[in-house]
Structure formats: structure tokens, C-alpha cells
């Protein structure tokens, strides 16, 4: 049931967090936006509510699978550790047990998330590159006058969508191309998911009413939201490096590896570059993980009620 509960929680989290993800992507790829609220107002004015949910179908499928694997792996790993150490899978785990299980959960995710992360980053950076190319074509020395009947040539997009992007990367760069930046992804998800599950467990223990082993719904909301924020706080530096490595595609590559990317980025842009997107990620993480954990706990309680 942990796999099913994790999948349902993941889908609910996507439904809540996808609008902010859309805003984040548009801010990163469209220079016309001066800030978060400017992007929100413009998107709603032009496209209404559905504009915030464009392209939702693929993330729902992938996130539900990844969330299912994450929660399922965490619970099964924790049960095995408790069985080996205490002789009972339902024994109360220590913080070290929770940390180790959370880390294992994060590492297992990498195999599933790396290809989709590569496709997402390539498509986002492709959009930005196309916009820059259009501006150069319109303002350069060879720009076509406004009244010219023949429009300036605009490069065709290399990737036509997520699946086409995955197929193209696999064909041109091999299967290793689909796992580009996976070293940074391992470092990001390993310790961030250890933080995620440990902070959730500790906060649940603090917020549980006297005489109860689990918190009530408000307690789960607070614990889940705070766990998400703390996880993203420690994940953001490696998330920046991961994105830069994955965007560094075929041809003239800028980075030779994880360490070179980190050193080059910090030298050119300062240490603050490692925390780009931190505020928006944390703002999104709180409501998303509130919903994820409430849905997860609700499904588990429902299952226990049906089985007893």
C-alpha cells in the first residue's frame, strides 16, 4: 500500500505545485517577465486558469511513478532495517534508520528521474535559445525590414516534445546522454531525501498530541510542508549544477564534469549561483508536500481501516 499511497500523494502534489512550476519555467525562459507576480498576472490574463496547467499529462504519469517508488522504497527499506536490527519490522526506528532509508529512497529515484530531467531541461533551454535567436535575427545587421514580404528565417526547434527529445538524445548521445548529470542528481537526491523523511518523522513526533503516536491533519500539513522546504534548501546547490550539466548537450560542451561545472559557475557568477531558484522552490515545496503527505497518510489510514 505504500507504493499506491505514494503514487496518489505524488499526483495530488503535482496538481498543487504545477502552476508554480509553470511560473518558474516562464520566468527562466521569457525575459519579458519582471517577477513572479508579473508572470502570474500575465498568464491568467492571457490564458486563464488552464494556462498554469499546460503540459500536465506527462508530469502526472512520471511523478506518480517516481513518488510511488520513493515512498515504497523508503517504507520497505525501513522495515528491513528494523527487522535486521530489532527483530521486528514494526519496531520504532532510530533517526539513523530513517536517514539511511530516506537516502536509499533518493538514490533509487535517480534511475527513473534522470531521463525526464534531461528532457525537461533541454526543452526549457531550447525555448530560451530560440527566443534569443529571434531577437538577434530581428535586430542584427542582416535583419529583414518590417515591410518585407519574406519573413526572416527562424531555426526549427531541435526537440518537438518530451518523447521526441528523449529519442533524439538517445540516438545522438547514446543511453549515457539520458543520464547526463546523474552524478549531481545522486548527490542532490541522496541527502535531500534523507533530510526530507527525517525532518518529517521528527516533526510528526513533536506535533503528535499527548498519548497519540501520529499527529492530526494540521500536524501532518505542517510537518509535510516544512519537510519539503528543508529538503529543497539542501538540494538546490546540486540542482543548479545538475541542470547546467544536463543543458550542456552535444557539440561544443562547456563543462567537463560535475566539479568543473561547480568551480566554473562559482568563479564566474559567485557563490550565490548555487542558490538560484531557492526562494521559488521553497515557496512551491511547502504547499506541494503538505498535500503529498496528507494524501499519503489518508490512503494508508483508509487501507488499514479496510483491512481491519
UniProtKB/Swiss-Prot annotation:
Q: Which keywords belong to this entry? A: Membrane, Mitochondrion, Mitochondrion inner membrane, Mitochondrion outer membrane, Repeat, Transmembrane, Transmembrane helix, Transport
User: Domain of life here?
Assistant: Eukaryota
Q: What is its membrane topology?
A: Multi-pass membrane protein
What switches on expression, per the entry, is described as: Down-regulated in hepatocarcinoma.
Chain segments annotated as transmembrane: 3-23, 49-69, 98-116, 190-210, 217-237, 273-293
- Tissue specificity comment: Specifically expressed in liver.
Presence of the UniProt keyword S-adenosyl-L-methionine in the record: no
- Which PANTHER family does the entry link to? MITOCHONDRIAL BASIC AMINO ACIDS TRANSPORTER-RELATED, SOLUTE CARRIER FAMILY 25 MEMBER 47
Q: Which family does it belong to?
A: Belongs to the mitochondrial carrier (TC 2.A.29) family.
Q: What is this protein called?
A: Solute carrier family 25 member 47
Give the species: Homo sapiens
Amino acid at each position: 500500500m505504500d507504493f499506491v499511497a505514494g503514487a496518489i500523494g505524488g499526483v495530488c502534489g503535482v496538481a498543487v505545485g504545477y502552476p508554480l512550476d509553470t511560473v518558474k519555467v516562464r520566468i527562466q525562459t521569457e525575459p519579458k517577465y519582471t517577477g513572479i507576480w508579473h508572470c502570474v498576472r500575465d498568464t491568467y490574463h492571457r490564458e486563464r486558469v488552464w494556462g498554469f496547467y499546460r503540459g500536465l499529462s506527462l508530469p502526472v504519469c512520471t511523478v506518480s511513478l517516481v513518488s510511488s517508488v520513493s515512498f515504497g522504497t523508503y517504507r520497505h527499506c525501513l522495515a528491513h532495517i528494523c527487522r535486521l536490527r530489532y527483530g521486528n519490522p514494526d519496531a520504532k526506528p532510530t533517526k539513523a534508520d530513517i536517514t539511511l532509508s530516506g537516502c536509499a529512497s533518493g538514490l533509487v529515484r535517480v534511475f527513473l528521474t534522470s531521463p525526464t530531467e534531461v528532457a525537461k531541461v533541454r526543452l526549457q533551454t531550447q525555448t530560451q535559445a530560440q527566443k534569443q535567436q529571434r531577437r538577434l535575427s530581428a535586430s542584427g545587421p542582416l535583419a529583414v525590414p518590417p515591410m518585407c514580404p519574406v519573413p526572416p528565417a527562424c531555426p526549427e526547434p531541435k526537440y518537438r516534445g518530451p518523447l521526441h527529445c528523449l529519442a533524439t538524445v538517445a540516438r545522438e548521445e547514446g543511453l549515457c546522454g539520458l543520464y547526463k548529470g546523474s552524478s549531481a542528481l545522486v548527490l542532490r537526491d541522496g541527502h535531500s531525501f534523507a533530510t526530507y523523511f527525517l525532518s518529517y518523522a521528527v516533526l510528526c513526533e513533536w506535533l503528535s498530541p499527548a498519548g497519540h503516536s501520529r499527529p492530526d491533519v494540521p500536524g501532518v500539513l505542517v510537518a509535510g510542508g516544512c519537510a519539503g522546504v528543508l529538503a529543497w534548501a539542501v538540494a538546490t546547490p546540486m540542482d543548479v549544477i545538475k541542470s547546467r550539466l544536463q543543458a550542456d548537450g552535444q557539440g561544443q560542451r562547456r563543462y567537463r564534469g560535475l566539479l568543473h561545472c561547480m568551480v566554473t559557475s562559482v568563479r564566474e557568477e559567485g557563490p550565490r549561483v548555487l542558490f538560484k531558484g531557492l526562494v521559488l522552490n521553497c515557496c512551491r515545496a511547502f504547499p506541494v508536500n503538505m498535500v503529498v503527505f496528507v494524501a499519503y497518510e489518508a490512503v494508508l489510514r483508509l487501507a488499514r481501516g479496510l483491512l481491519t
